[in-house]
Amino acid sequence: MKDMMMEVYNRLIDNPLIREKTSFINDNGKTEYRIKFYEVPETLNTTKPFIVIDNFLGPQTNAYFANNKALSIRFNYQINVESMDRMVTKQISKAVEETMKQIGFGRLDGGLDQYFNETKRFVDARRYRKNTQIHDTDY
């Protein structure tokens, strides 16, 4: 079984700008990324740029049918980019959008482009959708 959210994650860390802005070396000397699923862990250093991948409409759904069988799967993701620098947030968001386009996701209306005074962070949240190729339903 394939995992689309992990595929998105792996493609994001393949992007040089995203890798540069979100990577860090953990206590064990291993490279990690400030790219998280669903929510931000309390232990994450939020003074540095980070990304959250969320499925804003719930789990994937069947997109096309034939003979009562799903032929394609639809994925909806919201990708939040947050940092304390507005231009860094914009640079990462642009890199995310380019990466999502490369893997077949289209951008949807909605999202967020705002500064939150409580957290002192700029947030750019964009929504994306993709239908898998016909017969690619092993998710």
What are the residue ranges of the model-derived segments?
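Short beta-strand/turn micro-motifs at beta-sheet edges
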Residues: 63-69
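Oligomerization/assembly interface segments of phage tail-like spikes and tubes
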Residues: 71-84, 121-132
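Amphipathic alpha-helical segments
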Residues: 5-18, 91-105
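Small/polar-rich, solvent-exposed N-terminal microdomains that initiate assembly or binding
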Residues: 1-63
